[in-house]
């Protein structure tokens, strides 16, 4: 699961419950170098659909999955 994203340096990043790496955000993927979307709880404890796959959008939709 992910917390709602916070602002860091103008970009939104969401920290996972386990606190390891970024959960959401452009170019950051759940501690696995992805885009921060689509990784399940088996990959660091983050939920699916943690953020939208748009690096330029303002809607990361980091919530509780």
Swiss-Prot record:
The keyword Chaperone does not apply. The lineage of its organism: Eukaryota, Metazoa, Chordata, Craniata, Vertebrata. Belongs to the KRTAP type 20 family. It comes from the Eukaryota. Interacts with hair keratins. In the hair cortex, hair keratin intermediate filaments are embedded in an interfilamentous matrix, consisting of hair keratin-associated proteins (KRTAP), which are essential for the formation of a rigid and resistant hair shaft through their extensive disulfide bond cross-linking with abundant cysteine residues of hair keratins. The matrix proteins include the high-sulfur and high-glycine-tyrosine keratins. This is Keratin-associated protein 20-2. The keyword Membrane does not apply. It comes from Homo sapiens (Human). Keywords: Keratin, Repeat. InterPro entries: KRTAP_matrix (IPR052878), KRTAP_type8/19/20/21/22 (IPR021743). PANTHER family: KERATIN-ASSOCIATED PROTEIN 20-2. GO terms for cellular component: cytosol; intermediate filament.
């Amino acid at each position: 699961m992910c917390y709602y994203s916070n602002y860091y340096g103008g970009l939104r990043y969401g920290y996972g419950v386990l606190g390891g790496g970024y959960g959401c955000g452009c170019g950051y993927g759940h501690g696995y170098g992805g885009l921060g979307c689509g990784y399940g709880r088996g990959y660091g404890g983050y939920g699916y659909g943690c953020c939208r796959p748009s690096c330029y959008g303002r809607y990361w939709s980091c919530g509780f999955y």
